[in-house]
Amino acid sequence: MMDAQVQAHPLDVADHLAVACQRWNKRRAIYRPAGEPFDPSRCSVQPIEEAQAKAFVVSMHYSGTYPAARFRAGVFIKERFARERLAGVGVFSVPMNQKVVPRYFPGLTPNEGIELGRLVLSDELAANAESWALARMRRLLSKALPEVRGIVAYCDPVERRDERGELVKRGHIGTIYKASNATYQGRSSARTLWMA
């Protein structure tokens, strides 16, 4: 019998996410219908300060944590007759250890790579905004840190449940990374992670 660890079969996750776009709101998964039209004309992506990025990510992302950032960008939304407001954050961070970048990008030094530590968009943005936002964040990253030639991003197909066994996070299979021409490099080491 498994206690608070319940693993979803990757195909179950893929079937679910084929019809929905996963987002986070107050650390809980929510979903936008896949295929809804995204209007980029009312959005912009800009570099943002650490404090603003951290406050957004910690309040929205399921983990409630913030990585060691090297670069941060925000997605801003502007409604008619309203002030522009933050609706998403991408955090490009220091990888967990010095071996990550050379492992996935042979020939690069650790400083020539970066990890996409967090990408969190609020449910205010229509589905499919992720790939649009990520492309613009990557352009800004290239200007801010021209030495960076590789980005590592992880997807996590395993569900997370709280101490009561309630679903906190469905897994995801990296659809936005595929849409951004990322190359799948396989699984990282298996581990057990208990969330309090």
Model-found features: residue ranges?
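Conserved beta-hairpin
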Residues: 57, 70-94
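Charged, low-complexity intrinsically disordered segments and flexible loops
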Residues: 2-34, 38
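Acyl-donor binding region in acyl/amide transferases
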Residues: 44-47, 93-196
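Short amphipathic alpha-helix that is part of the acyltransferase structural core
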Residues: 26-68
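Short beta-turn/strand-loop junction motif enriched in small, turn-promoting residues
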Residues: 62-63, 80, 121
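A short, compositionally biased
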Residues: 68-70, 189
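Eukaryotic non-globular interaction segments with acidic/serine-rich, low-complexity composition
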Residues: 1-7, 114, 130
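Sequence-level motif detector for i,i+2 pairs with an aromatic at +2
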Residues: 40-43, 70, 87, 111
